[in-house]
């Protein structure tokens, strides 16, 4: 009887140790799986953290695309303004095209302001981005204002002086487009700035010549009033091109 009991106890002990051993093996496997899963989870967390950091701290370069688009709008509206002054009989249609460009420009400025608010890191100082966008948009607004005056005043005869001033704006707009592409190159920007400054002085001389001619001849008072306002707007557009150039040159020097 005792022998039977001892035998049973021995058998139970063997089974018990087998169970314990199997459990330990399983536990080791579970621990290995847990460690592996933990490592994977940490790797994923690290990757996500890095992705977020890259997104947060990477510079948003789309601002330069927006600046280039605004510069192109200046160019297209300037060309249209020159056509309008050459053919005032078609002023209403051309002015409508300029107005569309002006509206598109406002939409770009809105996008720029939104990006300033949502970008963690900007390629330029936020104040410079805002100022440059404002200056570029101002040129388009002034060109639109000049076109609107030609329509409002029922101008039917072209004046060579007005066309020549518009041509200065066209040439300055081309220089602005090149300036935007070279905004981080101080030496190139200095060249663009000098070129636009020469155009601005040419515009001032043309303005004085055109306004002087209005009062030098026996012009009807209503024509003097009309064209004085138009010449004022054209000269303002040329001056604003120079202001854009000054902002671009300042940005180039800051970021050289």
Labelled PLM ranges:
Residues 28-33:
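Short Gly/Ser/Thr- and charged-rich N-terminal loops/segments
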Residues 35, 39-40:
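Terminal intrinsically disordered, low-complexity tails
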Residues 44-256:
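Cytosolic, long alpha-helical scaffolding segments
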